[in-house]
Amino acid sequence: MRRTKAEAEQTRNDILKAALILFDEQGYAQTTLSTIARKAKVTRGAIYWHFENKEEILAALAQAQFTELNSQINAAIAAPDTWQNLADNFIAYFRGLLKNPDRLRFCCIFNQHGRIPALEKLYRDYTALWQAQSREAVQRGKENGELHRDADPEYLYFYLMMIFTGLVELCLDQPDAPHLAQYCERVIRDTIALMQTL
């Protein structure tokens, strides 16, 4: 019997969900397509219908996690008050991170990029994208008066990523810590305010 588009999409989502759990619980290298198929309750053939290999599954997971964030960053850059919008988007991201187990799982996996070759390329690609977005945001901030005209885009990117990475680590290590969401918001707003003085 021919499957509907909705059924095919559900199968794809089931595969991604199973892979996300297994990559987190037993590691990317230790996870096979067979174990993903068993976890998702599908055949290996169903996996190959949607994905050629584990690398494609990993890339699809990254796309699912970062597409919305990247779209929001691009919208913030285009807005008149670029850096205020970026602060709002980063705060929303961390609120979602603390409330969404799947997002937390993926961040745990993504943070292993130094030990997983397939992740290393993804990490480099997304880092290059975020660095380009940061440069554009700095340029916009200079043009609209939010940042100093002589602000160094490379330093501001480094500074922002240092804060962002630290907050992600705290969310992964202590997701249930009291006041974490509130403190994340405060740190982000203070960071953006400080960057506007640099």
Please describe what each predicted stretch is.
Residues 25-29, 100, 144:
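Short coil/turn segments at alpha/beta junctions that flank glycine-rich nucleotide-binding fingerprints
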Residues 41-51:
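Short hydrophobic/aromatic patch on the recognition helix
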Residues 58-65:
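Alpha-helical DNA-contacting segments of helix-turn-helix folds
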Residues 60, 74-101, 153-160, 181:
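Hydrophobic alpha-helical connector segments
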